[in-house]
């Protein structure tokens, strides 16, 4: 059977970047903060603000720095060509450690087969580098370096990134007020330092997913003592999609704030598509290797073997995948516990491994070969994302014996991974009513010794198809506050169909709101800067600043235009809901002006004097209770 792509849209020569993903944000500029060496340049987005109107004091408002996941795509000084991929960021750092070697070619059998297939030439990414691997006996994981007391360039990079110029913001008066947080036992410092990052990684409380073969990566960190992160999912299906479409899904997602991206492809040309995605991704890429392994055996779970899965791990590690979801906690003895569930096993990876276990009546080969998996992953610094194959698919099944039994096993596997100095996070539910969410977080912290938790929502009710980004956003905000480190987004199409670009954006913005709300509640240093700046802009009727400081400036601006479309409305001193006579903020401004004119402090208006003035006016007008108007 020919593997040649039939659709011309698949061809590499036609691939172009998505135009919507490369537009700079209005009144924003990409800035880079340099670290201790010239090649540590940490990207951020700086939002320029208007001067406060003269009526409100006329002061200059300092620019606000915000976290930026969009990579070079929103930098007008960078020429983007998806056919060449992004610039190499990390090779000098990796070279300086002198513990890796460049292989003469791909070492996975499947990778070699794909490379030798001439019919795939038109589809293949043209600028593939030979992969790196740890030298014999070496461990190249960030956790290994951290436990040796080494602060890597990646650790310094994420420390700078997490702070977002916090010292400068304080000096500019952008953080005059921040409410104290309640962190539920997290140890969040007033400022993130590179040494703190090293300590957290060494302890296992945080990870920097950073495969040595993903040199285009802009490093980021996942951990309960850092900013809450979000993940977005992409991937082709059996129906197929073009290279251009898959890269567009990536760039669109990171534009709106996706900190990592999981490629869940199940269709044709998975290997080639993944190469394009990684070469064009500034954020960590995660996969579920069992999906591709299943494709290799024609979808028959019972035909899976350790040897085939091992080759798939090597194939993906050599491409540069940063973290693997491994469903090693789905044990044979747990499968019967799901029999009386309302929704059974809803995890695709979990159901694959459950079917394999039952077909062979043997223990999960991902569990029995777990240390072999560790040996592969530490040679490339691929992080574990230990999959929750028995997560609840309905609130009726939340916190049951199957779910928590698997979680306890994931805790055991975490300790084995840590023995190999492997970075590890734990995946969680799913569907959980609000009153049971904290129990999930507490149980995970206990079983997995504070390894980062990564959850899908959770959805807090099952009655809202079409609105599951909201049902899950509620749970995501709660579990993020309780200590969850990364939240996997849910779109409005969850359970219903494949999301389009608008759905993806809606899901990401919903989860950015949840993550930020959790950061505020935890008391992350500087989390309130953006809120304070936007609130000040709102009170001063600086409309453009309100739009530009928001998570989604385009939608905010379009909603305002629906009511007040003229440019003059963008400087109006009233809001679009109440109009000029009933705007509460306009009235408050008038009260302040009155107080100032009467030489009365706005914060301590002389109420008695005001009452006396009104009483005298009542008498002068005839002391009539009612007057004709």
Swiss-Prot record:
Function (record text): Catalyzes the synthesis of the hydroxymethylpyrimidine phosphate (HMP-P) moiety of thiamine from aminoimidazole ribotide (AIR) in a radical S-adenosyl-L-methionine (SAM)-dependent reaction.
A biological-process GO annotation: thiamine biosynthetic process
Polar residues: compositionally biased ranges: 13-24
Residues binding Zn(2+), per UniProt: 431, 495
Residues engaged in binding substrate: 233, 262, 291, 327, 347-349, 388-391, 427, 454
Residues binding [4Fe-4S] cluster: 575, 578, 583
Region (Disordered): 1-24
Catalytic activity: 5-amino-1-(5-phospho-beta-D-ribosyl)imidazole + S-adenosyl-L-methionine = 4-amino-2-methyl-5-(phosphooxymethyl)pyrimidine + CO + 5'-deoxyadenosine + formate + L-methionine + 3 H(+)
Signal peptide: none
Cofactor mode of binding and number, as noted: Binds 1 [4Fe-4S] cluster per subunit. The cluster is coordinated with 3 cysteines and an exchangeable S-adenosyl-L-methionine.
Pathway in which this enzyme or protein is active: Cofactor biosynthesis; thiamine diphosphate biosynthesis
GO cellular component, one term: cytosol
MF annotations from Gene Ontology: 4 iron, 4 sulfur cluster binding; carbon-carbon lyase activity; zinc ion binding
Cofactor needs: [4Fe-4S] cluster
Pfam families tied to this protein: ThiC-associated (PF13667), ThiC_Rad_SAM (PF01964)
Gene name for this UniProt entry: thiC
Family, per entry: Belongs to the ThiC family.
EC number(s) per entry: 4.1.99.17
Keywords on record: 4Fe-4S, Iron, Iron-sulfur, Lyase, Metal-binding, S-adenosyl-L-methionine, Thiamine biosynthesis, Zinc
Name of protein: Phosphomethylpyrimidine synthase
Subunit structure as annotated in this protein's UniProt entry: Homodimer.
Organism of provenance: Pseudomonas syringae pv. tomato (strain ATCC BAA-871 / DC3000)
């Amino acid at each position: 059977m020919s593997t040649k792509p039939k659709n011309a849209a698949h061809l590499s020569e036609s691939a172009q970047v998505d135009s919507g993903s490369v537009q700079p944000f209005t009144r924003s500029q990409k800035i880079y903060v340099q670290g201790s060496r010239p090649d540590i340049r940490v990207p951020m987005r700086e939002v320029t603000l208007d001067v406060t109107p003269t009526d409100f004091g006329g002061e200059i408002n300092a620019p606000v720095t915000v976290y930026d996941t969009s990579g070079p795509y929103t930098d007008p000084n960078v020429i983007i060509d998806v056919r060449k991929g992004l610039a190499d960021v990390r090779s000098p750092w990796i070279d300086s450690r002198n513990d890796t070697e460049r292989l003469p070619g791909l070492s996975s059998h499947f990778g070699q087969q794909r490379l030798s297939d001439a019919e795939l030439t038109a589809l293949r990414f043209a600028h593939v580098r030979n992969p790196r691997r740890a030298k014999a006996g070496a461990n190249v994981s960030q956790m290994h370096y951290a436990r040796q007391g080494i602060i890597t360039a990646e650790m310094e990079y994420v420390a700078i990134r997490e702070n977002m110029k916090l010292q400068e913001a304080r000096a500019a008066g952008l953080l005059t007020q921040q409410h104290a947080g309640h962190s539920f036992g997290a140890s969040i410092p007033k400022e993130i330092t590179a040494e703190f990052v090293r300590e957290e990684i060494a302890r296992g409380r945080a990870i920097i997913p950073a495969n040595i073969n993903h040199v285009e990566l802009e490093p980021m960190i996942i951990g309960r003592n850092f900013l809450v992160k979000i993940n977005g999912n992409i991937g082709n299906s059996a129906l197929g999609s073009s290279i251009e479409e898959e890269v567009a899904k990536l760039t669109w997602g990171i534009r709106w704030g996706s900190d990592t991206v999981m490629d869940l492809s199940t269709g044709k040309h998975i290997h080639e598509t993944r190469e394009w995605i990684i070469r064009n991704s500034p954020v960590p890429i995660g996969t579920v290797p069992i999906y591709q392994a299943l494709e290799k055996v024609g979808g028959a779970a019972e035909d899976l073997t350790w040897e085939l899965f091992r080759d798939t791990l090597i194939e993906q590690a050599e491409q540069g995948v940063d973290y693997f979801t491994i469903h090693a906690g789905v044990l044979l003895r747990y499968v019967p516990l799901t029999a009386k569930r309302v929704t059974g096993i809803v995890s695709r990876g979990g159901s694959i491994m459950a079917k394999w276990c039952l077909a062979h009546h043997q223990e999960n080969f991902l569990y029995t070969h777990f240390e072999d998996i560790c040996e592969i992953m530490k040679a490339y610094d691929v992080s574990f994302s230990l999959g929750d194959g028995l997560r609840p698919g309905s609130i009726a099944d939340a916190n049951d014996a199957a779910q928590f039994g698997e979680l306890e096993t994931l805790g055991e596997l975490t300790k084995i991974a840590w023995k190999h100095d492997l970075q590890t996070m734990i995946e969680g539910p799913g569907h959980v009513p609000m009153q049971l969410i904290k129990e999930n977080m507490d149980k995970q912290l206990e079983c997995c010794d504070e390894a980062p938790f990564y959850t899908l929502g959770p959805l807090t009710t099952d009655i809202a198809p079409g609105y599951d980004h909201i049902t899950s956003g509620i749970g995501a905000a709660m579990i993020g506050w309780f200590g969850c480190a990364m939240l996997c987004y849910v779109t409005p199409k969850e359970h219903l169909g494949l999301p389009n670009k608008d759905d993806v954006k809606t899901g990401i913005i919903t989860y950015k709101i949840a993550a930020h709300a959790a950061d505020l509640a935890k008391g992350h240093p500087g989390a309130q800067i953006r809120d304070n700046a936007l609130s000040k802009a709102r009170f001063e009727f600086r409309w453009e600043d309100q739009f530009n400081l928001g998570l989604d400036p385009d939608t905010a601006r379009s909603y305002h235009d629906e009511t007040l479309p003229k440019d003059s409305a963008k400087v109006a001193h009233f809001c679009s809901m109440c109009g000029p006579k009933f705007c509460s903020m306009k009235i408050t401004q008038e009260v302040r002006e009155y107080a100032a004119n009467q030489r009365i402090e706005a914060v301590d208006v002389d109420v008695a004097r005001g009452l006396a003035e009104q009483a005298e006016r009542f008498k002068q007008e005839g002391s009539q209770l009612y007057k004709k108007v």
